[in-house]
């Protein structure tokens, strides 16, 4: 039986847990973080499952690994690890990982106050303010967003027919507005919203699995 010891730093983004993995990072194949993301999922997904899932992790945890950039103009690269997979982009994870990396001096910005970071979805720009040894705030300029599809529908076991649009902003997101079978967040309990959201997500993925592919980043899809 093989034995692996991972050194990590845990933090949080407004209460949402973040875990930066420092050691035992795999040697990934690929010329971009998008390609390396797929290589990780193919060969090393056990790392994600071991560190993100309970008992070591949490359903809301965002994890990540820092890698050297592929383009020397950028500062570094991030691979995101979540319970749901390896997201092409994660704002929660970015804010937490950047904060850890700066406060622990794990990265050296090329320009103080600005970081250009490679993620599987592309290159994001992060601005931050650091006072003494602490990061006081982090802002992100994300990859280009766009409306992918509109006026789609699925049949929910709990709510009936649900109409939605799909937008892209580093990941594909289903946007559900008020409608006949869905009134508002305030009309449901938190556990209902979590359960219904998962069911709706799974039905969208099953029905439209081949529909949502990034127009020029074919490795990014639903």
What are these regions (language model features)?
Residues 170:
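Glycine-rich ThDP/TPP pyrophosphate-binding loop and its adjacent helix/strand module
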Residues 1-158, 162-165, 174-220:
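A glycine-rich beta-to-alpha transition motif near the start of alpha/beta enzyme domains, typified by
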């Amino acid at each position: 039986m093989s034995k692996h010891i991972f050194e990590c730093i845990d933090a949080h983004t407004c209460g949402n847990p973040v875990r930066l993995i420092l050691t035992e990072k795999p040697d990934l194949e690929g010329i971009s973080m998008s390609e390396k993301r797929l290589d990780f999922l193919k060969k090393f997904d056990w790392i994600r499952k071991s560190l993100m899932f309970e008992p070591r992790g949490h359903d809301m945890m965002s994890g990540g690994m820092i890698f050297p950039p592929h383009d020397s103009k950028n500062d570094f690269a991030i691979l995101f690890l979540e319970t749901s997979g390896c997201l092409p982009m994660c704002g929660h994870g970015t804010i937490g990982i950047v904060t850890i990396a700066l406060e622990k001096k794990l990265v050296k910005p090329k320009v103080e106050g600005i970081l250009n970071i490679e993620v599987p979805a592309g290159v994001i720009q992060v601005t931050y303010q650091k006072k003494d040894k602490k990061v006081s705030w982090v802002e992100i300029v994300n990859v280009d967003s766009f409306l992918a599809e509109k006026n789609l529908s699925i049949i929910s076991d709990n709510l009936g027919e649900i109409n939605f649009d799909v937008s892209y902003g580093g990941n594909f997101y289903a946007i559900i507005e008020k409608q006949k079978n869905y009134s508002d967040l305030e009309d449901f309990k938190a556990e209902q919203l979590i359960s219904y959201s998962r069911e709706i997500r799974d039905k969208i993925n099953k029905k439209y699995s081949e529909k949502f592919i990034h127009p020029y980043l074919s490795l990014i899809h639903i």
